[in-house]
């Protein structure tokens, strides 16, 4: 077994690396550790993320920042706007531009305006 860490996980030096353990915490705070652990919650520089390990290969932190609801982001407001924004002035076309991806309905993802 190992010793419990701040996240309530056990640090087993032979099989996994716990990012909150000072012994295994990388100096750069970017997790590039090797192990066969499954998705384990971790905190890296105040941003919550998951260690994803589909196979016994190097695993990395995928940051999942949680923004407060009062955070003002003009880009997000544009994305939530139901009216399409003009991409170019009238009469100007760009035939080499790739097609736009389909619009994701944000309420289906559990986000509220």
From Swiss-Prot:
Residues 94-103 are annotated as: Interaction with host SRC, HCK, FYN, PIK3R3 and GRB2. The keyword Membrane applies. Residues 71-113 are annotated as: Homodimerization, and interaction with host AMBP/bikunin. One of its GO terms (cellular component) is host cell endoplasmic reticulum membrane. It is a lipid-anchor. Residues 27-67 are annotated as: Interaction with host HPX. Pfam families: HEV_ORF1 (PF02444). Palmitoylated in the N-terminus. It comes from the Viruses. A motif (PTAP/PSAP motif) lies at residues 95-98. It is found in: Host endoplasmic reticulum membrane; Host cytoplasm, Host cytoskeleton; Virion; Host cell membrane. The modification Phosphoserine is found at residue 70. Residues 1-21, 32-52 are annotated as: Hydrophobic. Residues 47-71 are annotated as: Interaction with the capsid protein. Keywords: Host cell membrane, Host cytoplasm, Host cytoskeleton, Host endoplasmic reticulum, Host membrane, Host-virus interaction, Lipoprotein, Membrane, Phosphoprotein, Virion. Residues 89-113 are annotated as: Disordered. Small multifunctional phosphoprotein involved in virion morphogenesis, egress and counteracting host innate immunity. Plays critical roles in the final steps of viral release by interacting with host TSG101, a member of the vacuolar protein-sorting pathway and using other cellular host proteins involved in vesicle formation pathway. Also acts as a viroporin and forms ion conductive pores allowing viral particle release. Impairs the generation of type I interferon by down-regulating host TLR3 and TLR7 as well as their downstream signaling pathways. The PSAP motif is necessary for the release of membrane-wrapped virions from infected cells. The viral particles present in feces and bile are non-enveloped, while those in circulating blood and culture supernatants are covered with a cellular membrane (quasi-enveloped). Belongs to the hepevirus ORF3 protein family. Forms homooligomers. Interacts with host SRC, HCK, FYN, PIK3R3 and GRB2 (via SH3 domain); binding does not activate the kinases. Interacts with host AMBP/bikunin and AMBP/alpha-1-microglobulin peptides. Interacts with host HPX/hemopexin. Interacts (when phosphorylated) with capsid protein ORF2. Interacts with host TSG101; this interaction plays a role in viral release from the host cell. Interacts with host SIRPA; this interaction down-regulates the phosphorylation of host IRF3. This is Protein ORF3. It comes from Hepatitis E virus genotype 3 (isolate Swine/United States/swUS1).
